[in-house]
């Protein structure tokens, strides 16, 4: 899951409300705050979720299949999104840098742990691709390099070509 950003407020709620020029600004800013705070997943997943919602595309997040698991049945593999489009559906996976090279996001892992995580991730990716191929499921993989504009452009291009 993505990192949650916490903000420490130094102003009381009463002062915050009083600083707002209108009641609607207060309501809108509060709703906006909670919408962002409640979103789950990585930043890339949030961008995809917002893109799909804004384009009225139906989707399900963290799609699993009962017969696709890693190591044992308690570790079902998840696809980022199941997208319903044009009387059909397909799966979408975001592919960040950890899918292509060993990555130490937290900075606290040993080289051996980094390599093991990478190899396990590669195995899970292979299993997902194999499962989709075997079951005639369309799997779209979109690179996520941390640039929201690039991701949105890639999503637009993907939908144009469907």
Question: For each predicted feature, which ranges?
Answer:
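Nucleic-acid endo/exonuclease domains
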Residues: 2-162
